[in-house]
């Protein structure tokens, strides 16, 4: 079956039933759940000091506890009795290299070594910086004035100066006579899709919600064993797409096809969902919801990252080994009073990784969290192809009478249909499956235009398919609608990526564990004291040829040297390569005004540029600084005065058009002959000292300087310590030491009496140090032995909570069956004739009527006399939106109108796309020389030039005086 044309948009439905009712009362407390496996709860308040219990039976040895922070260094103990000599221990591991000690005092200077071989000549260094600019020489004698040259041809016209400020708006002209209605122009091609606009600013945070009532605390679950490391988390949810770009201009209107026959096929299967549209701009931040009830404790988290390696603790003195027999362990005493809060110790080194424990029990699901904020509405998806109409469904139940919706746009009046004979009611068939979308039929030929029929009664039509998206309407903010029904609970989301470890919780009320095992070797000790000066070393062998040193940086410019004698001229060197163009210099002070030039002839008109496609509206650029005023161009030739035409009607201000591409540049005229140089202008005023320029880039490394003169004899100043040399080869192991004598075994000391427990000290002030790194998770303690508590009494119903935030919009429910046609309403009274309304929005394209015969073109009427200027009438009220009229026939072209008065300057339109680069302009006139710049700093002293070639022998000198006899 051929699908029919897309129907117009159906009327807006009545609003649905009101949302959910007020919040209900709090239900009775639930049954105690299974023990969870969540993290340890917060530390409770300290209990009253208990009494010392009797010694209990020997308990099982507990798990080794974590290594505690190093305690403070104790007082030095008394020397113990000499012990027996111990056995030779195993050789310990090599300790870490200690910190580099300070350099010792320099030993006596050794004998100078033999001179090394001369190194290879170094490469030529980079080109030096240009020297300072020389002082201006003395002015030469003025030359004789040359003959005046011939007058040069007029140069090309100068560039157009900047547009002047907008003039004052002129007086409102009289309303002109309405001209003949022009033919409707063809719609332009569809524009390219615009780029997404910049993201909007973040909305302000909403007010804080009222805190909710605390929920009933759950039963404390047993701590599970540390779980094994979980599998890598699923990838996170895809981030939101960028903001939706501006809609492009509407495309060309297509030909309407002939109405297809009603399809009677089976309903096809549901089509594939359309592509996801671009996400709209983020909406304003919603109000912060109230605090939800406390959820059930979650499963035990994965172990956090290992903490930073702590610094070395102070080494304590070894205590004497106890030799008493192990007594029976006492009964577990009641916990004593909480002691004073100790100062935080240094972070310990991370312990060895424990074995993976068994997987903990899965925690009970948490209570549903508060409703999330309403997300921004997504963009409208692409319209699907219309499927064949399905069979009519059963009659639905009467809905709740809703509020009257807004007045819909007036539809095209339909042709009165003939009333048919009512048939017998048919049996309601089963709902068919959704059929597959049929292929779009070819557009049919345009039929003849039909006559406009009378408006018929509203027919029992079904809701049409959604029409194409119309142009954006005016922003009339309607009243907020009622809160929608709370959506169904969504499916559980994918498991998120593991978040960063949270801050360390408060210290739990557990008992102190057993002392830990001895840790690994400590970090290297502190830097040692400076050693004594060593003996004088032997004279070293002559050193090898050193590696050529790196080119040193360019030194600071030296003082200006005295002018040297003029050297002999050497031979001319070859011409060097053309240097790169230097950076543009600072703008010089404006020179004296030159003589006025001759007015150039008007340039040839350029070819009109091709009409560019409307560009996308670009973001409004920042206002640039005002440019300098351009020179005023010569006045152009006065054009011929045109015949005055009749004054046209004042049109309404249209939207600013898109900036088109610039037209093709005109031909560049030939440059005129160079004129004679004018007389030098008077010297300008002394320029002001410019501001400090930005720091220049680091220049290339300079050439190595010449070898300086030898220094004075004797020992030089003490040099700075050299860099660390490479690590030497490991030394051979030293000789084995002699075993010491075995000492006498000391007598075991008496066991001291147990002291009384001290009173709890006052709580110390909280420390102000930075929080230490998070330590590794501790081993799970044994489960506590407690009786199951009896359920508490039923609480009284709580107060009604504050209304929660607006819930997310629920999913669109299935389309209900079409309602039965309503009874035809009584015709309303004839209303007064409405005023001429604004032009209505473009409605959906209706089926093309049969083309009517072309009417004969009427004769052109005589030109009427120009009417008097009428008085300006008062501005009328805004009219009611009228129906869109039919396109009129194209009238004859009117006589050319007189140029209208210049209207007020409109708002600057959005910046269009950047045009192609223009052609190179004609060379400008030679500018006047600016004032000489300030004398730069003296450059580095130049090196002596190479000696020139030996000159020819001079003529013989005159004979000398005779010698003495």
Swiss-Prot record:
Sites of 3-hydroxyproline modification: 670, 937, 952, 955, 958
Record's subcellular location: Secreted; Secreted, Extracellular space; Secreted, Extracellular space, Extracellular matrix
GO cellular component, one term: extracellular region
Glycosylated residues, chain numbering: 88, 881
Biased composition (Pro residues): 1-21, 156-168, 625-637, 768-780, 815-830, 950-965
Region: Disordered, residue numbers: 1-965
5-hydroxylysine modifications at: 88, 253, 326, 536, 647, 806, 869, 881
4-hydroxyproline: modified positions: 15, 18, 20, 29, 32, 35, 49, 64, 70, 79, 85, 112, 115, 121, 130, 136, 157, 166, 169, 196, 199, 211, 217, 226, 232, 235, 250, 259, 262, 273, 282, 297, 303, 312, 318, 335, 344, 350, 356, 365, 368, 377, 386, 392, 404, 413, 422, 425, 443, 460, 466, 472, 480, 492, 501, 509, 515, 524, 542, 557, 563, 584, 590, 593, 602, 608, 626, 635, 644, 656, 662, 671, 680, 683, 704, 713, 721, 730, 748, 757, 760, 766, 771, 777, 783, 791, 797, 818, 821, 824, 896, 899, 917, 932, 938, 953, 956, 959, 962, 965
Tagged with keyword Secreted: yes
Low complexity bias locations: 102-118, 136-154, 202-241, 359-385, 394-413, 472-482, 569-583, 596-623, 652-668, 697-706, 718-730, 851-865, 899-932
Compositional bias ranges of the Basic and acidic residues kind: 52-66, 866-880
Keywords attached to this entry: Extinct organism protein, Extracellular matrix, Glycoprotein, Hydroxylation, Phosphoprotein, Secreted
Principal location class: secreted
Phosphoserine carried by residues: 94, 572
Superkingdom classification of source: Eukaryota
Tissue specificity field: Expressed in bones.
Pfam families: Collagen
Function: Type I collagen is a member of group I collagen (fibrillar forming collagen).
Other information: These protein fragments were extracted from an ancient phalanx bone collected at Arroyo Del Moro in Argentina.
Sequence similarity: Belongs to the fibrillar collagen family.
Subunit structure: Trimers of one alpha 2(I) and two alpha 1(I) chains.
Protein name as it appears in the record: Collagen alpha-1(I) chain
Species for this entry: Scelidotherium sp. (strain SLP-2019) (South American ground sloth)
């Amino acid at each position: 079956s051929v699908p029919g044309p897309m129907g117009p948009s159906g009327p807006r439905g009545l609003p649905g039933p009101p949302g959910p009712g007020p919040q209900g009362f709090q239900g009775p407390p639930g049954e105690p759940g299974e023990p969870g496996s969540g993290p340890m709860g917060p530390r409770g308040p300290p209990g009253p000091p208990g009494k010392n219990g009797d010694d209990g039976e020997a308990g099982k040895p507990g798990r080794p506890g974590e290594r505690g922070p190093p305690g403070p260094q104790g007082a030095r103990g008394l020397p113990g009795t000499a012990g027996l000599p111990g056995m030779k221990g195993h050789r310990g591991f090599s300790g870490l290299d200690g910190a580099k000690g300070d350099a010792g005092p320099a030993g006596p200077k050794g004998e100078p070594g033999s001179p090394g071989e001369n190194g290879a000549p170094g490469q030529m260094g980079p080109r030096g910086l240009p020297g300072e600019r020389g002082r201006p020489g003395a002015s030469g004698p003025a030359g004789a004035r040359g003959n005046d040259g011939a007058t040069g041809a007029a140069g090309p016209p100068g560039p157009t100066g900047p547009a002047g400020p907008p003039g004052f708006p002129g007086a409102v002209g009289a309303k002109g006579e309405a001209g003949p209605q022009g033919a409707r122009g063809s719609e332009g091609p569809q524009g390219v899709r615009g780029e997404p606009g910049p993201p909007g600013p973040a909305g302000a945070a909403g007010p804080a919600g009222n805190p909710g009532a605390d929920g009933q605390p759950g039963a404390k679950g047993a701590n599970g064993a540390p779980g094994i490391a979980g599998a890598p988390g699923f990838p996170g949810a895809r981030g939101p797409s960028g903001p939706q770009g501006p809609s492009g201009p509407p495309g060309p209107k297509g030909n309407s096809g002939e109405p297809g026959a009603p399809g009677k096929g089976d309903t096809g299967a549901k089509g594939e969902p359309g592509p996801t549209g671009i996400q709209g701009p983020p909406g304003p931040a919603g109000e912060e919801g109230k605090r939800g009830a406390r959820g059930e404790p979650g499963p035990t988290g994965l172990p956090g990252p290992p903490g930073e390696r702590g610094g070395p603790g102070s080494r304590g003195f070894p205590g004497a080994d106890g030799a008493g027999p192990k007594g029976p362990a006492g009964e577990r005493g009641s916990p004593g009073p909480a002691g004073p809060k100790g100062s935080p110790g240094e972070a310990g080194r991370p312990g060895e990784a424990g074995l993976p424990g068994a997987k903990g029990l899965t925690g009970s699901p948490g209570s549903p969290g508060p409703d999330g904020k309403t997300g921004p509405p997504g963009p409208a998806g692409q319209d699907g192809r219309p499927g064949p109409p399905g069979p009519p469904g059963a009659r639905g139940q009467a809905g709740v009478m809703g509020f009257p919706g807004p007045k819909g746009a007036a539809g095209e009046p339909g042709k009165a249909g003939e009333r048919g004979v009512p048939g017998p009611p048919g049996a309601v068939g089963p709902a068919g499956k959704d059929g597959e979308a049929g292929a779009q039929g070819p557009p049919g030929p345009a039929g003849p235009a039909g006559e406009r029929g009378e408006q018929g009664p509203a027919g029992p039509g079904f809701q049409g398919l959604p029409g194409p998206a119309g142009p954006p309407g005016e922003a009339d903010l309607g009243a907020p609608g009622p809160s929608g029904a709370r959506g169904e609970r969504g499916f559980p989301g994918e498991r998120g990526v593991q978040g960063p470890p949270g801050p360390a919780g408060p210290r739990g009320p557990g008992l102190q564990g057993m002392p830990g095992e001895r840790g690994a070797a400590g970090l290297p000790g502190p830097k040692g004291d400076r050693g004594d000066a060593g003996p004088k070393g032997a004279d070293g062998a002559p050193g090898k040829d050193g590696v050529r040193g790196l080119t040193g940086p360019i030194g600071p410019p030296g003082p200006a040297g005295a002018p040297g004698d003029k050297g002999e001229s050497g031979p001319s060197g070859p011409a060097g390569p053309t240097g790169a163009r230097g950076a543009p210099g600072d703008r010089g002070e404006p020179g004296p005004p030159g003589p006025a030039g001759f007015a150039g002839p008007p340039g040839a008109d350029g070819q009109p540029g091709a009409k560019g496609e409307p560009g996308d509206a670009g973001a409004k650029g920042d206002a640039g600084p005002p440019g300098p005023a351009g020179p005023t161009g010569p006045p152009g030739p006065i054009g011929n005065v045109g015949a005055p035409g009749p004054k046209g009607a004042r049109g309404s201000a249209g939207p600013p058009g898109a900036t088109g591409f610039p037209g093709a540049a005109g031909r560049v005229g030939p440059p005129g002959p160079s004129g004679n140089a004018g007389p030098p202008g008077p010297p300008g005023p002394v320029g002001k000292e410019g501001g400090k320029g930005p720091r220049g880039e680091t220049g290339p490394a300079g050439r190595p300087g010449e070898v300086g003169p030898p220094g004075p004899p004797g020992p030089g100043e003490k040099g700075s310590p050299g860099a660390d040399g490479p690590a030497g080869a490991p030394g051979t192991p030293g000789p084995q030491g002699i075993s010491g004598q075995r000492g006498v075994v000391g007598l075991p000391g008496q066991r001291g009496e147990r002291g009384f427990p001290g009173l709890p000290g006052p709580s110390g002030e909280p420390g102000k140090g930075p929080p230490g790194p998070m330590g590794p998770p501790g081993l799970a303690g044994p489960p506590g032995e407690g009786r199951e508590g009896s359920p508490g009494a039923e609480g009284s119903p709580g107060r009604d909570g504050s209304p929660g935030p607006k819930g997310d919009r629920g999913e669109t429910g299935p389309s209900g069956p079409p309602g039965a046609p309503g009874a035809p309403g009584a015709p309303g009274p004839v209303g007064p004739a409405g005023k001429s309304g604004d032009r209505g929005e473009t409605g959906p394209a209706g089926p093309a009527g049969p083309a009517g015969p072309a009417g004969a073109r009427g004769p052109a009427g005589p030109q009427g006399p120009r009417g008097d200027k009428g008085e300006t009438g008062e501005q009328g009220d805004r009219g009611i939106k009228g129906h869109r009229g039919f396109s009129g026939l194209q009238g004859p072209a009117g006589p050319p109108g007189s140029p209208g008065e210049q209207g007020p300057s409109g708002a600057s339109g959005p910046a269009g796309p950047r045009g192609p680069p223009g052609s190179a302009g004609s060379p400008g006139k030679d500018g006047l020389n600016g004032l000489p710049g300030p004398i730069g700093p003296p450059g580095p002293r130049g090196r002596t030039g190479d000696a020139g070639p030996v000159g020819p022998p001079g003529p013989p000198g005159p004979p000398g005086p005779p010698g003495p006899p």
